């Protein structure tokens, strides 16, 4: 459904990292940008967020999510649930084509375009066209190594870029 990106996140204990590639693809066959930043710090650096999907839609969701974070004083779960409610019920928001991964030291969540809030069981998740590849790599590295979340997300995204034509190796990793 969503092309032109991969976002992967890993949470181990109180350490969490979110990584994204830099490729922006126009249509099915033209790379428009190699160095986009799809992972950001929010709420005074206490929350990480990454997006897959339409760039304009994702920026709208970032703005809405950041507003909810402020409204609920940094409570990630509450902000995510309230954004999901708005996403499901608001006529304009329902048309947005994007997904978000948001995380802090306590929670790692996926916010989908259907207004779902999903907290992965194993502290590992990925979205975007290269998401399945990055997810498989991150799960294996989490299970069989002692690498940090930062290193796991970097290596998982690097592997996804070897497989997915919509993902490049211009990797940005944010960690808290």
Curated annotation (Swiss-Prot):
Known partners and oligomeric status: A double ring-shaped homohexamer of HslV is capped on each side by a ring-shaped HslU homohexamer. The assembly of the HslU/HslV complex is dependent on binding of ATP.
Subcellular location per the Swiss-Prot or TrEMBL entry: Cytoplasm
E.C. number: 3.4.25.2
A cellular component term, taken from the record's GO annotations: proteasome core complex
Native source organism of the sequence: Desulforamulus reducens (strain ATCC BAA-1160 / DSM 100696 / MI-1)
Keyword Hydrolase: yes
Record-level Gene Ontology MF annotations: metal ion binding; threonine-type endopeptidase activity
Stored PROSITE patterns: PROTEASOME_BETA_2 (PS51476)
GO biological process: proteolysis involved in protein catabolic process
InterPro entries with a match to the protein in the record: ATP-dep_Prtase_HsIV_su (IPR022281), Ntn_hydrolases_N (IPR029055), Proteasome_sua/b (IPR001353), Proteasome_suB-type (IPR023333)
Protein's name in the database: ATP-dependent protease subunit HslV
Catalytic residues (positions): 5
Annotated control of activity: Allosterically activated by HslU binding.
Catalytic activity: ATP-dependent cleavage of peptide bonds with broad specificity
Xref: SUPFAM superfamilies: N-terminal nucleophile aminohydrolases (Ntn hydrolases)
Keyword list, A-Z: Allosteric enzyme, Cytoplasm, Hydrolase, Metal-binding, Protease, Sodium, Threonine protease
Role, per record: Protease subunit of a proteasome-like degradation complex believed to be a general protein degrading machinery.
Residues reported in the UniProt entry to bind Na(+): 161, 164, 167
Family membership noted in the UniProt record: Belongs to the peptidase T1B family. HslV subfamily.
């Amino acid at each position: 459904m969503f092309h032109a990106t991969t976002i992967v996140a890993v949470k181990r204990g109180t350490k969490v990292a979110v990584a994204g590639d830099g490729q922006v693809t126009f249509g099915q066959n033209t790379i428009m940008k190699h160095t986009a930043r799809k992972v950001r710090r929010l709420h005074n650096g206490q929350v990480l967020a990454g997006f897959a999907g339409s760039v304009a839609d994702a920026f709208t969701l970032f703005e809405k999510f950041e507003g909810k974070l402020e409204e609920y004083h940094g409570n990630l779960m509450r902000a995510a649930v309230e954004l999901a409610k708005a996403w499901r019920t608001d006529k304009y928001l329902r048309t947005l084509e994007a997904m978000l991964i948001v995380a802090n030291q306590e929670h790692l969540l996926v916010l989908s375009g259907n207004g779902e809030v999903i907290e992965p069981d194993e502290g590992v998740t990925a979205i975007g066209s290269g998401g399945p590849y990055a997810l498989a790599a991150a799960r294996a590295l989490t299970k069989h190594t002692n690498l940090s979340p930062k290193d796991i997300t970097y290596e998982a995204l690097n592997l996804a870029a070897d497989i997915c034509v919509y993902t490049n190796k211009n990797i940005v990793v944010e960690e808290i």
